[in-house]
Amino acid sequence: MSHSPLFTSPPKSLCILRLSAVGDVCHALAVVQHIQRHWPQTKLTWIVGKTEMGLLSGIEGVELVPYDKKSGWKGVWNLWMFLKNNQFDALLNMQTAFRASIISLGIQAKYKIGFGKKRSREGQWLFVNRRVQDPETPHVLDGFMAFADYLGVPPAEMLSWQLAISDADREYAKQFIDPTRKNLIISPCSSKAEKDWLVERYAEVANIAHQHNVNVIFCSSPAKRELEMVKKITALCDFQPVDASGKTSLKQLAALIHQANLVISPDSGPAHIATTQGTPVIGLYAYHNPLRTAPYHNLDNVVSVYEENVQKEQGKPSSELPWVTKLKGKNLMAEIQVEQVVAQMRALNLF
C-alpha cells in the first residue's frame, strides 16, 4: 500500500456497484469477500445484474440488490428509491460502463471511488471523487483488488470464493458426472461467436479425451446459438458425449464444474466460475489479452495466440499497448491447434 488508507478503522457501510458480466462478478466476489473477512462488522450492499444474481444469491453477509438492465430508466429510478435511505461511507464503482455511472448518481456515499487513469473508461472519472491506484499487473481481478487496497484492507495472501450452492444443486449436477472416470467439461461458447473455437476442433479434443476413458460433458446457456453450437460439435463426435447444454442454472453449473476434473472454455463466464470452484481450466484466447482476462490462478494453463497477433497487428508487444487492446483480425481462434490443447490436458493430468 503506497498511499494513506481511506479508512483507518472499519467503515460502517459500503456499496459495491458491479452489475455484469458473470466472469467480472466472480472477480468482484473475491474482493467483496476479502473485505468481509477483514471487516466483518461492515455492512455490505452489492448492486448486481439480474442474471448474475442467479450465481450470487445466498452469499453470506451481503445485501444483494438486483438491477435488470432491460428495465431502463424505470429500473434505475426504482433502484434509487430502494436505496434512498442509505448513506454509505463509500461506493466502490467497479464498472466503467456509462450505465453504472448513471446509477451511481442516485447512491448517497461520502466517497465515490472509481478506477485509476489507465483503467477508467466511458467518462467514469466525472462521476467519482476518489480514484484507486491501478496495479502494475494487468489482470482485471488485480484492478478490482486495488479498491480494497485503497480502502485500507490488508493485501490478500490467497484469494478465495464462497458461493452459496445448495445440496439440491450439487445433487442435480451429479447426473452428468461419471464417478468411475475423470470428467471433462467443454463449455464451447463465449458471448461473441468470434471468440469461440472451431466446431471440428472441439469435437476432435472430445474424441481424444474419450479415447483416454474420460467422461466428456458439454455445457452452455439456453441461448439458441449456443445450443446449436453444441449440437454441431456432438454430431462430429465418435461417441455420445453427455449433453448438459441449457440444462443448468448458474449455480447448478458451478456445482457441476466443482465435481469435474477439468474445464475447457474460451473467454467466458464458465471459465471464471471454474476458478471459484478450484477446478483447473484451459482458457482459449485470441482476441483479448489472457494476462488481463484469463481465469485467475489458471494463467499458466491458457492456450493463447494473442501475443503473436498483437505483434502482427500493432507492431509491438502487449506490454507497450493500452490496457484494453482487443484484436481485430478475422478468424484468429482458428490459429489455436488441437495439439496445443491436448498438451495442456496432459500437463493437467487429465490422461
Functional labels for PLM-detected ranges:
Residues 1-351:
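Catalytic machinery of carbohydrate-active enzymes
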